Amino acid sequence: PCDVWSVGCIIFEYYMGFTLFQTHDNREHLAMMERILGPIPSRMIRKTRKQKYFYHGHLDWDENTSAGRYVRENCKPLRRYLSSEAEEHHRLFDLLEGMLEYEPTKRLALSEALKHPFFSVLQLQPAPKAWDSNRDISR
């Protein structure tokens, strides 16, 4: 499941041209995740070993700091990054939402992601033979 998350982040980067979570700070990373993907599920907050990042079941994050303002101004809900209203763009973001699901048990497996409607336009056909072994080339 974590590999699928990483692939989702990479696909987003290919689409937009920049990384989804541009930070090395753990707390800021969590704030970006909440801003882009919505609140972290309370069950996950209760089970984390990183309780220092949370207070009363919510991310302990001050939006009035320079980092807080940066996240507020530069991160937006995932679907707001759509650059087109075309159907294939909506299918891509549906795929990304499945790949970036917080809950690992609800996140798309790689095999499921590959069967997603976004990829349906890629009709898998047998590769053409590069070499026909019955052909006589001796002349």
Task: Kindly give the residue locations of the regions a language model identified.
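C-terminal lobe substrate-recognition/regulatory segment of protein kinase catalytic domains
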Residues: P39-E97
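Activation segment of protein kinase catalytic domains
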Residues: F18-D25, R107
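Conserved catalytic-loop aspartate of Hanks-type protein kinases
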Residues: D3
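Hydrophobic alpha-helical patch in the C-lobe of Hanks-type protein kinase catalytic domains
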Residues: L30, F93-L96, L110
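Regulatory extensions flanking the kinase catalytic core
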Residues: G98, T105-R139
